[in-house]
A protein has these predicted regions:
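N-terminal secretory/targeting leader peptides
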Residues: 2-134, 138, 157, 163-385
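A gly/proline- and charged-residue-enriched helix-loop-helix capping module
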Residues: 137-155
Length: 385
């Protein structure tokens, strides 16, 4: 009888061992790859907190509100799994150190303008604005469907930074001046806050370019440190009170026809995110990019009316010879940049090729329509001019 019980006991023992092993495997699998009730892959509930530093004063409409809107979108879309705290210029790092802060991991994200890093990355100017270059609509087309974004990421990759388009103001104003410009001669000796490639162009045209952050502009104009300033357009310029420190407001924005801002993300921090949160960051950036252009398009109108009617700002077009000398020097500056920097030559080839193509189509679409509209609608005039 005892011999008959050996096999069943052995079988039971092996079965229990096998069941226990399967249970451990299942537990390990569940811990490594959670599964929802319906059998789909469960979403991690880990809460991640990021810092986002900016080059703008806290609460500045348009530029400053864009990163706040981005952070809100990310938190809502991720159901609170990714929370981003936004810091204004100087709260964590000075405005012109935002790129380095993201590169070094001091903050996971930044928001600013790429031409602020011109001293470190000369080719970065292409991703804010090129004088007499693309509009916001054209820039977005080049970035997202013309290869521009891929080149941008190649440019920032050595610094461990991943860029996204972060909003556009549309065509800007040429700037505020404390004296009237009647000809190109009036540029001589003029000190102007104007960054990027346009700063080089302005200096070559007889003026002196000065690099200032947004929070320093008003006082610098008020105290005579500078004679002129370009910032954005009526919406933001009115907020900064620039109509109080300068009499003349010039157009068009030859230097920033479609100023593009940027979100920068520390690449290692981005790589650590689950795939769905990566997609949320990218999607929120894309939405914020378009939203800023919408906001400036809507708000500039009433702000310009206020500047003209309430503050009696003197609105002026730049004289033709001023535009001519600025364009001539812009060509020279761009050619020199391409000669000195192989990456600039590579990016410029893509940029110029896209611009040539889009200009051809816009000649019979955008421009043709605007001409047709002007022909049938009442003319627009400014009483001050």
């Amino acid at each position: 009888m005892k011999e008959r019980t050996v096999l069943p006991i052995a079988v039971v023992g092996l079965s229990l061992l096998w069941i226990g092993t399967l249970g451990l495997w299942a537990l390990d699998a569940q811990q490594a790859d959670p599964v929802a009730v319906d059998g789909s892959k469960a979403v991690s509930t880990e809460q991640i907190k990021w810092k986002l530093v900016t080059t703008w004063p806290k609460g500045l409409p348009g530029l400053g509100s864009a990163p706040e809107n981005f952070a809100r979108r990310v938190e809502e879309m991720s159901n609170g799994r990714l929370s981003i705290r936004v810091y204004g210029a100087g709260e964590v790092v000075p405005p012109f150190e935002v790129f380095d802060a993201v590169s070094q991991g001091v903050a996971e994200m930044g928001h600013g303008a790429s031409y602020y890093w011109k001293g470190k990355i000369p080719s970065s100017v292409f991703y804010t604005a090129v004088p007499f270059g693309m509009t916001a609509q054209e820039m977005n087309g080049w970035l997202h469907y013309g290869g521009g974004l891929e080149l941008w990421r190649e440019l920032y990759a050595p610094f461990g930074v991943r860029p996204f388009a972060g909003g556009s103001t549309g065509v800007q104003m040429a700037g505020w001046f404390n004296r009237e410009l009647k000809s190109a001669e009036d540029l001589k000796g003029l000190k102007m806050r104007i960054p990027g490639l346009a700063g080089e162009v302005f200096t070559a045209s007889g003026g002196t370019s000065v690099r200032l952050a947004g929070g320093e502009i008003y006082t610098s104009m008020q105290t005579g440190v500078i004679d002129a300033v370009e910032w954005v357009g009526p919406y933001n310029d009115r907020t900064l009170g620039l109509m109080e420190v300068a009499e003349y407001y010039y157009y068009p924005g030859w230097h920033e026809p479609g100023a593009m801002l940027e979100f920068t993300v520390n690449q290692e921090a981005f790589d650590r995110l689950p795939a769905d949160l990566q997609a949320i960051v990218e999607g929120a950036a894309r939405a914020t990019n378009q939203d800023m252009l919408d906001e400036f398009t809507a708000r500039n109108n009433s702000s310009l009316t206020s500047l003209l009617d309430e503050y009696e700002t003197k609105l002026r077009p730049l004289p033709d010879d001023v535009m001519d000398i600025l364009h001539s020097n812009a060509v020279i500056a761009l050619d020199k940049l391409k000669e000195d920097d192989p990456m600039a030559a590579k990016i410029s080839a893509s940029y110029e090729d896209f611009l040539d193509g889009v200009r051809t189509y816009h000649e019979i679409s955008e421009r043709a329509y605007l001409n047709a509209r002007d022909r049938v609608l009442p003319p627009i005039s400014f009483t001050d001019q």
